[in-house]
From Swiss-Prot:
Any one GO BP annotation for this protein: rRNA base methylation
Biological classification of the source: Bacteria, Pseudomonadati, Pseudomonadota, Betaproteobacteria, Burkholderiales
Name this protein carries in UniProt: Ribosomal RNA small subunit methyltransferase H
Keywords carried by this UniProt record: Cytoplasm, Methyltransferase, rRNA processing, S-adenosyl-L-methionine, Transferase
Compartment(s) where it occurs, according to its Swiss-Prot or TrEMBL record: Cytoplasm
Role, per record: Specifically methylates the N4 position of cytidine in position 1402 (C1402) of 16S rRNA.
Predominant place of localization: cytoplasm
Length: 363
């Protein structure tokens, strides 16, 4: 069964990768690449779509790329990969990788690609995945409690809920769903599974609703819990962290990063990474150096874009979408590498990793 998918922020995302004078809200407006450089990238550049989905963004990008350009598309979803393979069969510029964008650096290296000219990520769950009850992402449709992006590997949400402790469930729901009734929800799940296992989405939604004491206007009481479980079972934030680090390492000078996020956890991570890489190192700030001798930022922020009223009217999912864009400068990475610019991740149940080489401003 085919499900309609409308790509969110389609034109702004592709513009962000290709237009020399692209600038979103809050963008730096000086020192960006010239039009000739941008045109050369469009004609012969290498681009990555880390979240192919049903290919809306990829098709628009291909329409605007030259015949010598190359596009590498990633997705964990077997259904998305089937669509991508059909596209690649008719367009020699397309290379398909069945896997997540977290492995971008390794997968590109295996194909002889050492640098790229642009990467776009459309985070979260897609409309076809939500609309397909059999995938288990929606609390509005009866389906198996799955939620895996890649249905060929890994435990389902039902598998994890059957064995997780109350503390583990509480921590995941609180951290990844920002649910203030996380403890009550975890206890309700534990009580329910003691009598019979949770097998379907509606069973879980009903269980969660019984534990959430107050209702947020316009939001189902299971929204935050479903988000948390999906993020956890697919390791979404951990994979985003790896992808942001890879982008910093792979992007050529003038190359662009364009990331669409749909909730505050993702957007905060992207925003913090761009902000950290857009600040010059300050270790030598008090030394008598000329400005040209000081380290420069790794990224130049090109701002953010949100959907306008017209797009939201035609696609309600666009309401919460935020596109953030950054441009790679000529400054080389330091000895600490890209990880120093990515926010430290704390996976529920594990200690927070130290952030190596984090640069601090002097007090």
């Amino acid at each position: 069964m085919e499900f309609e998918h409308r790509p969110v922020l389609l034109a702004p995302t592709v513009d962000a990768l290709l237009l020399a004078d692209f600038a979103g809200k809050g963008a730096a407006r000086s020192g960006r690449q010239d039009g000739a450089q941008a045109d050369a990238r469009a004609q012969r550049g290498v681009f990555v779509d880390g979240t192919f989905g049903r290919g809306g963004h990829s098709r628009e990008l291909l329409r605007r790329l030259g015949p010598e350009a190359r596009l590498v598309v990633f997705d964990k979803d077997p259904q998305a990969i089937a669509v991508a393979n059909e596209l690649a069969a008719g367009d020699a510029r397309v290379t398909v990788v069945h896997g997540g964008f977290a492995a971008m650096r390794e997968e590109l290296a295996a194909r002889g690609i050492e640098s790229i000219d642009g990467v776009m990520l459309d985070l979260g769950v897609s409309s076809p995945q939500l609309d397909d009850a059999g995938r288990g992402f929606s609390f509005m449709r009866e389906g198996p409690l799955d939620m895996r992006m890649d249905t060929t590997r890994g435990p389902t949400v039902a598998d994890w809920l059957a064995q997780a402790s109350v503390d583990e469930m509480r921590e995941v729901i609180a951290d990844y769903g920002e649910e203030r009734f996380a403890f009550q929800v975890a206890k309700a799940i534990a009580a329910r599974r003691a009598t019979r296992p949770l097998r379907t989405t509606l069973e879980l939604a009903e269980c969660v609703a019984s534990a959430v004491r107050t209702r947020e206007k316009g939001q189902h009481p299971a929204t935050r819990t479903f988000q948390a479980l999906r993020i956890y079972i697919n390791r979404e934030l951990e994979e985003l962290s790896r992808a942001l680090a890879s982008a910093l390492e792979l992007l050529a000078p003038g190359g662009r990063l364009a990331v669409i996020s749909f909730h505050s956890l993702e957007d905060r991570m992207v925003k913090q990474c761009i902000a950290a890489a857009a600040r010059p190192a300050v270790a030598h700030a008090r030394l008598p150096l000329r400005e040209s001798e000081l380290p420069q930022p790794l990224y130049r922020s090109l701002g953010r874009v949100q959907a306008d009223d017209e797009e939201i009217a035609g696609n309600a999912r666009a309401r919460s979408a935020v596109l953030r864009v950054a441009e790679r400068t000529t400054e080389p990475l330091g000895a600490d590498g890209a990880a120093a610019f990515v926010p430290a991740m704390r996976v529920p149940g594990e200690a927070a990793p130290a952030r190596r080489g984090a640069r601090r401003r002097p007090h």
